[in-house]
Amino acid sequence: MQILFNELSLSGQFSDQVDFVKNGLLSFIGVLREMQGFSALLLKRSDVWKYKITPTKTLHSFLINNEFRKFDEVRRLKSAIVGLTKEPFWDFDSKQDLKSTYFFDENDIRGSSPAEASERDKVVVSFVSSPTSLDPLNIIRNDVTIPLLNLTRSGKLTEFLWSNNEISFESYLKVRYSGGKLDFSKLDEKISFSSIQSSEQFVFIDTFRKFEELTWSQIHTDKGLDYKEYHGSIGITYRDIKTYKFRVSQKFRCHGFREKNSFIVIGFETDHKLSNRG
């Protein structure tokens, strides 16, 4: 998938560089990291460095500014976006038709990344708080509205790919819940995704969303989840670990263990055989 960086979303909207880092850059980098998980290709204009992050400062001036050199976090953030000023650049091979017109909000945007995206995969990534931060971002091409998926926060791309059947159930869960209360990175292959049918996936997703939204005290007392210690044996790997299970449906269970503020998912139970043993 080709995703274009929307340079029009840098319109000098941030009051200063601190505001840019706090209210613009953090969420933007979250989207970039999500894109990396799906090997998406980020394309941009070759002159993106000249667009303004504040009324007086450009992206280029921010990247070369040593004002924040003492702050490791800001240096890491800068490193994450320095690629915006490097190849690949789409304007070396533009797909825009010379005979076509491209407008946004009655403004001619020919030559911009949103215009280019309307001729490619129709996905852009943008900074927040600009006139072109809307989602969908509607481009009028030859008097026809072309809605672009506008990625302004992490999670949007994952949901889009999942709803369009472009990623597996496993990929969806691992990315969707990365860094949250549920962790799917240590699944036991013997009781993992192969036991779940396509028609059953949304039951699991609904329960996982609920689990993610509740506090741990609510999880422990929620009658629907019925979260409790599992007293049977899942396998020799987990014999020294206190494992737990919670209810996905009357028939389905999810097994795992608590590690700090996360529930590390070991696997899924769709036939009640494990629960019959503990």
Q: What is each stretch, according to the model?
A:
Residues 252-265:
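Active-site beta-strand-loop-beta-strand hairpin of nuclease catalytic cores
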Residues 1-248, 263, 267-278:
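Basic, Lys/Arg-enriched alpha-helical interface segments
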